[in-house]
A protein has these predicted regions:
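Short, intrinsically disordered, charge-balanced linker/junction segments flanking boundaries
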Residues: 564, 575-585
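Solvent-exposed coil/turn segments that connect beta secondary-structure elements
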Residues: 492-494, 558, 578-580
């Protein structure tokens, strides 16, 4: 009986092995040698010619030899190898861009790893298929189509699998040449190469009425029949820098360091988009009445789940320490202006639980207000908890820093939310050239890895600023005041009794805007945007007369409240004995 059972079991095992072998044969690498024929049996060094083909310059026995030869031949030179998964067979180039193609390993998103460290704690992020990557170099190649490249993914300095990208020299972009990309997909998407004309991401300065603006344009890496791909993003992302010239196109690898050339060699200046890098621990200055006005201006009616939610977002801001404008515009983006199926049927404005691989897993809430409060008070809170592995800063940012690193696969997620916030600000100001949220507070970037945040000047350390053990980029803070060579900042973390409060897995916790503040040495912060930093007010008890040259008027007691006016007349102002519970008059 036992022998018979063994024989019976062997049949399905053999069948399974045959199935796997057949599957392997079906998914075996296609050579695509007919697209761009090669003249070398090993490593071929070529230059891209004006028709989009390759002129052979030499054959080499190793990748190292070929790579060295390529570097002597200028920007149009490449190394090609027959074992490459890409139809062009390019495995290295002197200048160009890459496009994500995770389908070669059955993925719908591409995971990339922090460059320059072998630590098991190296940071990672992920992007959608067919998205642009700024190429730096090919760092390894095994002769069988596998290797690694060094590239930049929306600011994130990355190590990326060569198998899962297609390399495109800038010659194809500059000369408007078509190139075959894709192929060797194992998940049924783009099973054969497609012909496309790639485009480089640009930032162009435009004058629109009273606003000098930055127009961001990014393209997908997929099209057919040699056409130009569709936009991955086409956005007015905010005001342009004062030094930027109308009509000029700039290039950037990280959204803030700008260059005059697509190779990003000729640096022209640094400029941080206020809405993109604004810490969420910063109060919005725009009232609830403006929220419906913004929706109406975009032809959104009362049937939207976002209608009449202005007070809800401002209450969430007051209770949980999340900027109401940025929270609202995130909801606009995630919920399709409050009209998506998740918003209408589940009161889910933020896509919680809806993963790229399983969108139907999305959460349901009993009301819109509940969904907003849970997002602000619990879910998003952990993305700006410095102890959480998803923490990369408290701004929306990009793939280098901010909530966008781990929150979404969209490489332009932070820019899309920034664009909506800027649009909201203009509408609130009736397009008169003014902006309310923009530059409303001084914002700074902490310069040093693992810098300390103190409970007072020269006091005790409450927490440090690193994003884990290997990484810190663009840790932005709202600067509230200056005193004795120190900056008072709005704390990213919740604080309790002068110490960081661990919020993981806790219920709702009220964020006190006046007590959740810290101190950092002024020399450790580079101011990047906003108003001049005010001096920390001196505490006065009793009647006094203070001579001042001007007076900033705020919405409430404390520097955490927005400035609503400025008394410019020189003179004496009476300060009365009216000290508030929080210590401010």
């Amino acid at each position: 009986m036992k022998n018979r059972k063994k024989k019976v079991l062997l049949l399905p095992i053999v069948t399974m092995l045959l199935t796997l072998c057949n599957a392997y044969e079906i998914q075996a690498k296609e050579s695509y040698s007919e697209y761009y024929p090669m003249g070398c049996h090993a490593y071929e060094v070529d230059t891209v010619n004006d028709s989009g083909n390759f002129d052979q310059k030499g054959c080499y026995a190793s990748f190292a030899e070929a790579s060295n030869a390529m570097k002597q031949l200028g920007d149009d030179a490449v190394v090609r190898h027959a074992a490459s998964y890409s139809p062009s067979k390019i495995i290295a180039m002197n200048s160009g861009i890459a496009y994500s193609y995770p389908q070669r390993e059955g993925g719908i998103t591409l995971d990339v790893k922090q460059y320059g460290t072998d630590s098991i704690y190296a940071k990672t992020t992920y992007i959608e298929k067919h998205r642009e990557i700024f190429y730096t170099s090919t760092d390894s190649y095994d002769g069988n189509g596998n290797g690694t490249i060094h590239g930049t993914v929306s600011g994130f300095d990355s190590v990326i699998s060569l198998k899962n990208v297609d390399l495109v020299p800038f010659k194809f972009v500059k000369n408007n040449l078509s190139i075959y990309l894709g192929g060797n997909s194992i998940n049924g998407e783009d099973p054969v190469p497609f012909l496309t004309k790639v485009r480089k991401t640009t930032y162009t300065v435009e004058q629109n009425g009273s606003y000098k603006e930055l127009h961001f344009t990014a393209y997908k890496g997929w099209a057919v029949d040699g056409k130009v791909p569709a936009y991955a993003a086409d956005l007015i992302i905010g005001p342009a820098a004062s030094w930027m010239n109308v009509g000029t196109t700039y290039y950037s690898k990280n959204d803030y360091d700008f260059y005059s050339d697509m190779e990003c060699r000729n640096y022209v200046g640094t400029y941080y988009n206020y809405y993109q890098f604004m810490p969420l621990r910063q109060k919005s200055n725009i009232p609830a009445s403006a929220y419906n006005t913004f929706l109406q201006a975009n032809n959104v009616s009362g049937s939207s789940k976002l209608w009449n939610t202005g007070e809800m977002f401002l209450e969430a801001q007051e209770n949980y320490g999340i900027n109401a404008l940025m929270l609202f515009t995130q909801a606009v983006h995630e919920s399709g202006w409050g009209t998506s199926a998740l918003a209408m049927n589940r009161n889910n404005l933020f896509g919680w639980g809806a993963f790229d691989s399983n969108p139907n897993n999305a959460a349901s809430f009993t009301s819109v207000a509940e969904g907003i409060n849970i997002h602000a008070g619990k879910s998003l809170r952990e993305y700006i908890n410095t102890s959480d592995g998803r923490f990369f800063g408290s701004h929306f940012g990009n793939k280098e820093s901010g909530i966008s690193v781990k929150y979404a696969s969209d490489a332009y997620y932070g820019l899309k939310i920034a664009s909506l916030a800027y649009q909201f600000d203009k509408i609130y100001n009736d397009y008169d050239g003014n902006l309310t949220e923009y530059n409303s507070y001084p914002i700074g970037v902490i310069k040093n890895y693992g810098d300390a945040i103190y409970d007072s000047i020269n006091g005790n350390v409450m927490y440090t600023t690193e994003y884990g053990s290997t990484y810190q980029r663009n840790y932005t803070v709202t600067v509230l005041a200056e005193k004795d060579g120190w900056y008072k900042i709005q704390s990213t973390d919740y604080l309790e009794n002068g110490k960081k409060l661990d919020t993981a897995k806790k219920d709702f916790i009220k964020y006190d805007w006046n007590t959740n503040v810290g101190w950092i040495e002024k020399s450790h912060v580079e101011l990047i945007a906003g108003l001049d930093v005010e001096s920390e007010p001196t505490e006065i008890i009793g009647s006094a007369v203070v001579n001042v040259s001007g007076l900033r008027v705020r919405q409430g007691p404390g520097l955490g409240y927005a400035m609503v006016g400025y008394a410019q007349e020189n003179g004496a102002y009476n300060v009365y004995d009216s000290k508030q519970a929080d210590g401010y008059t």
